[in-house]
Amino acid sequence: MQAATSCDLKFRSTDPTSRNKCFSHAIPKRVAVTCGYRSESFSFPNGVSVSRSDWQSSCAILSSKVASVENTGGLADKIAAVNGHTNGSVNLGLVAVESTNGKLAPAQPLTITDLSPAPLHGSSLRVAYQGVPGAYSEAAAGKAYPNCDAIPCDQFDVAFQAVELWIADRAVLPVENSLGGSIHRNYDLLLRHRLHIVGEVQIPVHHCLLALPGVRTDCVSRVISHPQALAQTEHSLDVLTPHAAREAFHDTAAAAEYISANDLHDTAAVASARAAELYNLQILADGIQDDPGNVTRFLMLAREPIIPRTDRPFKTSIVFAAQEHKGTSVLFKVLSAFAFRDISLTKIESRPHHNRPLRVVGDGSFGTSKNFEYMFYVDFEASMAEPRAQNALAEVQEYTSFLRVLGSYPMDMTPWSMTSTEEA
């Protein structure tokens, strides 16, 4: 990976006149930086084929019962500072988002060209999420880290890299929905990047139908939103807007922003109540999700793991690959290692093994066939501070060619209400 200080840094400020709407919700100040960085430079040359000693080191960190020794500022001395603080010859000269009529417009999401190294500074925890202000991911970031400085990113990969490059301190990203299933992209990114899972948070999805002030439902000829949101409100939309066309948009809150920015009086969006507040839209219908049990699970990611404990329920996430030529038959042995120790599994997900996608089986007399090879993601209810979890993983290691602990973290045990728009 190229050294951060060798990036071709370019700077830009956000033009407040680029939007034709003034929003009422004050958003924390943002900074925008452009860098000649390319995403492929973060690909690990050996893919997922890390050594066993690598995994053992990670496991030792997670199972340690001794608090980590804190860095005494040495790292901060080596990384360029921001907001007027300099390091050596590097001065980022960042400019905060300007205001219009005394009100701050919602910040533009970080893109892949906005990534530039920055250290921890100030008292607010900076949390990256995918989407624009008003997205459900922003609500998850606020629940996970109250009073944080939320940083919108236009892609999941950018959110990962924002943490790695010290632009953000944490990332909060979705991994599964109770109706839509797993978000495979983020499972792949968990393996590609070296961030650690330090927590989880579950958010009820509370959809609203939004439009410009004064627009009635019978005037709506088009409804836009994320494909999952449109699918989750299909029956309600059939009743509310039976003749309206439905068009996919990349993000729920971005759909609301698009209507507001372009003054579209014939278009409605499926998004959160917070998006209506941010983009000066009215709520035509509240709580239009077809299934009240619509919940999205988010993971909290950090550069360093947390010390696992036993005084509260913990969950541990791992990823592994079967030994070569063994195929998925070893999955039974792996699962037995947990069952024998009375460890409950909460999630099993398979993803293609990108380094070894196919396995040739058979002999010359009857020909050969090709089977797919997979990586397996498993969540189980135990802390890495517990001997049973350590012993289970020691046995699992015997059956696998690759094993990595993604994190051992507290389970989200907080109650939530499906009827509150504040949750969305």
From Swiss-Prot:
Residues 126-303 form the Prephenate dehydratase domain. Pathway: Amino-acid biosynthesis; L-phenylalanine biosynthesis; L-phenylalanine from L-arogenate: step 1/1. Pfam families: PDT. InterPro entries: ACT-like_dom_sf, ACT_dom, Preph_deHydtase, Preph_deHydtase_CS. Its main location: plastid. Gene3D superfamilies: 3.30.70.260, Periplasmic binding protein-like II. It catalyses: L-arogenate + H(+) = L-phenylalanine + CO2 + H2O. It is found in: Plastid, Chloroplast stroma. Expressed in roots, leaves, stems, flowers and siliques. More abundant in stems and roots. It comes from the Eukaryota. The keyword Zinc does not apply. Its EC number is 4.2.1.91. Keywords: Amino-acid biosynthesis, Aromatic amino acid biosynthesis, Chloroplast, Lyase, Phenylalanine biosynthesis, Plastid, Transit peptide. Residues 319-410 form the ACT domain. GO terms for molecular function: arogenate dehydratase activity; prephenate dehydratase activity. CDD domains: ACT_CM-PDT (cd04905), PBP2_Ct-PDT_like (cd13631). Residues 1-34 form a transit peptide. It is an enzyme of class 4 (lyase). One of its GO terms (cellular component) is chloroplast. One of its GO terms (biological process) is L-phenylalanine biosynthetic process. Converts the prephenate produced from the shikimate-chorismate pathway into phenylalanine. Has no detectable prehenate dehydratase activity. This is Arogenate dehydratase 4, chloroplastic. It comes from Arabidopsis thaliana.
